[in-house]
A protein has these predicted regions:
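Right-handed parallel beta-helix
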Residues: 111-124, 144-158, 170-190, 201-219, ...
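Predominantly extracellular/luminal carbohydrate-interaction, adhesion, and secreted-enzyme modules
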Residues: 136-138, 220, 253-257
Length: 337
């Protein structure tokens, strides 16, 4: 069927990729869904038709459901093919994503919003590394004092909820686009440049994410870089993050936070994610307490996908602390790294 995309963002021509993305850049931000489950993107029409198992998947039986897209340049149309494995798409629930975000202000500084009780699903979010604009299906976009509560958040192509970084045109995927310096230097620059863009306790952070059910997103359940300082993340159920293994890189976890300064993460239940909680850079005054983490590892015998990272319940990286990890139950093969 033909589809009309009314703005400049076409997820079926936009690729997932950027700084700290280690997998091949062959997946689109678009996706096809069958009965609320994302299909696996094929690189060719032949692969789509064959519908073979994708071995790195954590759910190989689901990986035979495929889709493929190409552009008809003569008609200026996006064409999508799908292999539903014999299911009739006119009788099943079949959807595609189009929106880049669902509830996220286009401007920064939109403070003190409460977002409560919504079911948010199926957005064409983009890869969200730390030295880039970090979008999600929901997010305050460099603001202060949001409450995101009692929501179901699922099936984002990349991130579910973003407490992340603003768009800085002079430091956005700069290594990928300009091929200078390094992604690590871009992160150092982001810390310094943030001071010129209002990164103070008076302006940014102090958010609350609570009692949300976050699942089946392919980069993170919750992501953040600098914008999540002084926040509380509590009583959330986060699971099945990055189980398709079609995306790979250094920004994948149930919760992935850079600069989780004075952030408390408590009483969260996190399982079946590539990683449970990853605090990267500046985990200063961070406390992880009373969380239940388990099965944050691939099924036994599953081959590693290209670009995939190691798995563990909690990972603290590039942080001089102090970071307090107390009263958690960690049952995965690797607990803390």
């Amino acid at each position: 069927p033909e589809m009309c995309i009314r703005d400049s963002y076409n997820p079926y021509t936009t690729m997932v990729g950027g700084d700290w993305y280690f997998a091949p850049v062959v997946r689109h931000t678009g996706a096809v869904y069958l009965n609320d489950r994302q299909l696996y993107e094929a690189e060719t029409l032949e692969e789509c038709i064959k519908g073979e198992v994708y071995a790195p998947s954590w759910e190989p039986e689901w990986s035979v459901y495929k889709w493929y897209t190409e552009q008809d340049k003569e008609k200026n149309q996006t064409v999508i093919y799908a292999n539903f494995q014999g299911k009739n798409p006119t009788e099943e629930k079949v959807e595609i994503n189009v929106r880049r975000n669902c509830f996220m202000p286009s401007k920064t500084g939109v403070n003190y919003i409460t977002f409560s009780g919504f079911d948010v699903s199926k957005a064409a979010t983009t890869w969200a590394p730390p030295a880039a604009y970090q979008d999600g299906m929901i997010g305050p976009h460099w603001s202060k004092g949001w409450i995101i509560e009692d929501c179901e958040v699922s099936n984002s192509k990349c991130c579910g909820i973003s407490l992340g970084k603003y768009y800085d045109p002079e430091n956005d995927h700069y290594f990928t686009r300009k091929h200078v310096k390094s992604p690590t230097q871009m992160e150092r620059d982001a810390v310094c440049r943030g001071q010129y863009h209002g990164w103070t306790k008076e302006n940014i952070g102090s958010h609350i994410i609570r009692r949300c059910h976050i699942h089946h997103c392919e980069q993170t359940g919750i992501v953040g870089r600098m914008g999540g300082v002084f926040s509380i993340i509590e009583d959330n159920h986060i699971h099945n993050i990055n189980n398709m293994q079609q995306l790979g890189g250094a920004e994948i976890s149930g919760i992935k936070m850079h600069a989780a300064i004075d952030v408390v993460m408590r009483r969260n239940h996190i399982h079946h994610c590539t990683m449970g909680i990853w605090c990267d850079w500046e985990a200063q005054g961070t406390r992880l307490t009373q969380n239940l983490l388990h099965d944050n590892c691939p099924p036994e015998g599953t081959p590693k996908a290209e670009g995939a990272m190691m798995s563990q319940d909690i990972f603290i990286e590039v942080g001089h602390g102090p970071t307090l990890i107390d009263n958690n139950i960690m049952l995965s093969p690797v607990s803390v790294r």
